[in-house]
Swiss-Prot record:
GO terms for molecular function: rRNA binding; structural constituent of ribosome. It comes from the Archaea. This protein binds to the 23S rRNA, and is important in its secondary structure. It is located near the subunit interface in the base of the L7/L12 stalk, and near the tRNA binding site of the peptidyltransferase center. It comes from Methanocella arvoryzae (strain DSM 22066 / NBRC 105507 / MRE50). Keywords: Ribonucleoprotein, Ribosomal protein, RNA-binding, rRNA-binding. This is Large ribosomal subunit protein uL6. The gene is rpl6.
């Protein structure tokens, strides 16, 4: 697919988009997200019910960045209107893993492979984490924060110096919505 110099994104009903300098803010029923879009030669503006990302340059990197910005803006609009949800599953063979949410910024994973010390994973941004039996549900409006939080939880359960074909314990992403 050839990269385009101009991308137009329709603003869904119930979402308002404002551009102030290089900062784009989306507001919807689930909340508000602001993000700075600063790249030489690329401008982001609103026109009626559309957000327009455009460039005057012809080089590959600039055109690719136009597409990247368009995707980020679509994700922001989807997040404030519908939200995102990741489902993770707690998997263990012998030692039952105990997962607890501490405050708004940490998840503790206890008794992982029988370890005495609990492992921790950081919660990024405004992501909400709930534990329901052997399932962990992450919800939020920022797709990047949600994905980073899920990655932090998966990486906290990474098994080192053992055969991964035998030791398959951990917390894994099962679905994204």
């Amino acid at each position: 697919m050839a990269a385009e110099k101009v991308r137009e994104i329709e603003v869904p009903q119930g979402v308002t988009v404002t551009v102030s300098g290089a900062t784009l803010t989306t507001k919807g029923q689930k909340g508000q997200i602001s993000r700075e879009f600063r790249f030489p030669g690329i401008s982001v503006r609103t026109d009626g019910g559309k957000v327009i990302v455009e460039t005057g340059k012809d080089d590959k990197q600039t055109k690719a960045t136009v597409g990247t910005y368009a995707s980020h803006i679509k994700n922001m609009m989807t997040g404030v209107s519908e939200g995102y949800e990741y489902h993770m599953k707690i998997v263990y063979a012998h030692f039952p893993i105990q997962v607890k949410v501490e405050g708004k910024d940490k998840v503790t994973i206890g008794n992982f492979l029988g370890e005495r010390k609990a492992r921790t994973a950081n919660i990024v941004g405004e992501t909400k984490v709930t534990v329901q039996g052997d399932k962990v549900v992450l919800t939020g409006i920022n797709k990047e924060d949600l994905g980073q939080t899920a990655a932090n939880i998966e990486q906290a359960c990474r098994i080192r110096k053992r055969d991964p074909r035998v030791f398959q314990d951990g917390i894994y992403i099962t679905s994204k919505a």
